[in-house]
Amino acid sequence: MNEENETSGEKLWTAEFIGLSATNFFHFMAQYVLIAGLPICIMNEMKGGELEAGLAMTFFQIGTVACRPFAGRLIDRLHKGRLLFGATLAFFILMLAFCFAHTEEELYALRLLHGIEFAVGTTAAATLAALVLPASKRGTGIGYFALSTNLAMVVGPLVGLLLVHFFGTLAMFVFLTISALFTLWIANRRKLPQKIVLPAEKEAGKSRFALVERQALPASLLGGLVFFAYGGLLTFIPLYAHSLGLEGSVSAFFAVFALVILATRPFIGSIFDKKGADYTVYPGFLLFFVGFLCFAAARTPVAFFFAAAVLGAGFGALSPAFQTLAVASVAPERAGLATATYFWSLDISVGFAAATLGLVAANFGYATLYGILCPAVIVIALLAYMRLSKGTVKKKKTA
């Protein structure tokens, strides 16, 4: 995006914010389309197996996790508008390249590069979105911005499966190429305030080499614990639903989950901005905790969907709250590194959940996973938040 010297006042739904939210949505939608469609492509057209299909996700995760902290440093040190343009251009080129990939090795290379671009593109969009928002509406705005990720999570797999099933994998790649071209346009069509896009002044000392924002670590780690529990939900729900004879309800589960987030997001963000984090975080922890207990006890479609609604309300309150706290913990010139630190924590947490919680499910069952372990993680996060909140209050009193 180009520069503009005038800001947009206290308005929330500016063209800049809408464009950045759309950029985030299409990045995440492409990822979820590929998560659903690439395994079918590899196994049916390239005659690979489950291992080869899984490697496509592994290479993407390697690129994302390895690049995320560097992305934050780049965003703070370089011209943010030009960096966003470069990332969205790379996004378009990579989606186009998928149309011409004919071997597993070519797909793996593209997925690795896609992971790197995804880390830069989503971190840049999230950082700029936080900076264009008025401070008085940051909680509400980041909540709506995060909603673009939630919607992509629901829409992406459905679109991917439908395209592959009815039109083939080439149609899926063509669709992603067109989406990426639209992203390139909408991300860069509007001008941004010059003070937002210009690089921060060079720092002295060790902080200029930091790849993690220490001030944002508490909120990032708390968000990581929430996403660790969410990762267990996201990864193993198809298997859990199958064990209950509810495999046909998985898509509807995520639809209910997303709809509840959509319905509650406006007033949750408003409460955060007007009354503070505690008024959304504590109810969010309670709802997320109860939601997992309901999920573990569900045996019918009605109970299954009720658990989805409660989990959606809890997750919808917690996720944007910790992202807002992470960004608010630093000066604007370090927002990129703070955002990258937050997302890096989420990347690692979801990946670690997929790698470890499967062992719990295999040895102790899904009732233990969802009824004991995930609620325990939520309790640990709650206790950590309470301790950190008390420490913050003490610092304010002694200041």
Please describe what each predicted stretch is:
Residues 61-69, 153-154, 258-266, 351:
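Residue-level signature of mid-helix packing/kink "hotspots" within the transmembrane helices
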